[in-house]
Amino acid sequence: MKIYLVGGAVRDSLLNLPIKDKDFMVVGATPEQMQQLGYRQVGKDFPVFLHPKTQQEYALARTERKVGLGYGGFSCYASPDVTLEQDLLRRDLTINAIAQDEAGNLYDPYHGIADINARQLRHVSAAFAEDPLRVLRVARFAARFHDLGFEIAAETMALMQHMSQTEELTALTPERVWQEVDKSLGGPHPEVFFEVLRQCGALNILFPEIEALFGVPQPEKWHPEIDTGLHTMLVLAQASSLTEEKAVRFAALVHDLGKALSPKEHWPKHHGHGQKGLPVIKSLCERLRIPNEYRDLALLVSDQHQNVHQAFELRSETIIKLFDKADFWRKPERLEQLLLACIADMRGRTGFEHHAYPQGDYLSACFSAASSVDVKAIIAAGFQGAQIKQALNSKRIEVVEQVKLNWQQSQTKQTP
C-alpha cells in the first residue's frame, strides 16, 4: 500500500502557489484495509475515504470506462492492481497528473512538469474527450493561470473544438455548468473563461445569449471597440478589477444581452436594450439555476444602467423613483453594486479604461441626502396614513433637488 499526493496540490506547489486542498491517492489497498486503518468511506460511485485525523480525502487508485453521455457517464474500476500510471492517465491535464510520494519524490509519467515550465495546458490522453465537463475546466484553468502565461496546447484546443460539435456538452447538468462558471467568476480573469469557450465553439451551446452579442455593432463614437461581444468581455474584465463580488461580475457579463435583440436595420443603435434584456436574463438564470442574488442584481443593472449613465440629466423625481424601484432603502448595498457595474460598463471601452465616473459620486450623494430624511419628524408634523408616504417622497425629492443644485454650482465654479 502506497500513498501519493496528487492533482492540484502538487501542481500548485511546483508553481509556488498557495495550496488550498490536498487530495491523496492510494495504490495497492482494498476498501476493507482502509476501514481497518480507521478511514471512513464517503464515496458512493468509487472508493473515497476520509483520514481519521485530518479528514482529508484519500481515493483508491482507479480506472474509468465511458458507458454513457455526460460527465457522469463513467464506470469506475478500483482494485489493488490498478497502478499509479493507470490512475494518472484518466486525469484531464498533464499538469494535474503529477504525483508525489511520502518521501517527496515526484512521479510524472505524462510530462506535466515540462508543460508547467512551458506554460501549456495539455490533455493527458484521448480519453479527455469522454468528459464534456473538461471543456469548462480547461477554460477555467486558462483563466486562473492567465497571469502566469499559460496557454491551451493546440492539440487540446482542437480536441475541445471537436467535443463542442458533439452532443456531449448538452448532456451537462445546469448545476455543473454553473459551478464552473461561478468558480471562474471568482477568479482573476473570468473574461478569459468565456473567450476560451467561444474559441472552442462551446459558448454558442452553453451560453447562446452571450455568443449572440458578437458581431453586433455599437456606435463608434461611444464604443471605439464597436463589437458588443468584445465590449462585454472588456466590461467583465473591468468589473473583476473593481470588485471580488461575483454577483457584480455576473451583472457586468449580462448587462447588454438586450443588444442582440435590436433590429439590424436600427444598428448600431440599441434603443431600450436594457429593458429588452430582462426576459433574456430571466431565461438564462432559470435555465442554469443561477442564485437569486445574482439574478436580481443582473436585472437591476440591465434595467437601470442607462439611467445611471445619464444621472446628471435625470429629474429629482426620477432619481427617487429609481431608488424606490431598486429598493435601496432596505438594501443600500445594492446601490454600490449597481454603481460598480456601471463604472465597469463605462470603462469597458477602448480608450476609456481609466476614466472617472462622477455619476457614481453624484447618485451616492443623492441617496445619502434622501436617506437622511426623518420619517419621525414627518409623523410628528401631523401627517397620517398615506399622507406620510407622500410627504416622505416629497421631502426626499426636495433634498435631492438641493444636491442637484449644489452639484451644478460646484461644476460651474470648476469651469474656467
Curated annotation (Swiss-Prot):
Amino-acid positions noted as binding ATP in the UniProt annotation, renumbered to this chain: 8, 11, 91, 137, 140
EC number: 2.7.7.72, 3.1.3.-, 3.1.4.-
SUPFAM superfamilies (UniProt xref): Nucleotidyltransferase, Poly A polymerase C-terminal region-like
The organism's place on the tree of life at top rank: Bacteria
Binding site residues for Mg(2+): 21, 23
Necessary cofactors: Mg(2+); Ni(2+)
UniProt keyword terms in alphabetical order: ATP-binding, Hydrolase, Magnesium, Metal-binding, Multifunctional enzyme, Nickel, Nucleotide-binding, Nucleotidyltransferase, RNA repair, RNA-binding, Transferase, tRNA processing
Record note on cofactor: Magnesium is required for nucleotidyltransferase activity.
Catalytic activity: a tRNA precursor + 2 CTP + ATP = a tRNA with a 3' CCA end + 3 diphosphate; a tRNA with a 3' CCA end + 2 CTP + ATP = a tRNA with a 3' CCACCA end + 3 diphosphate
Description of how the protein assembles with itself and partners: Monomer. Can also form homodimers and oligomers.
UniProt-listed NCBIfam families: PRK10885.1 (NF008137)
Domain remarks: Comprises two domains: an N-terminal domain containing the nucleotidyltransferase activity and a C-terminal HD domain associated with both phosphodiesterase and phosphatase activities.
Protein name as it appears in the record: Multifunctional CCA protein
Organism: Shewanella sp. (strain ANA-3)
Gene name per UniProt: cca
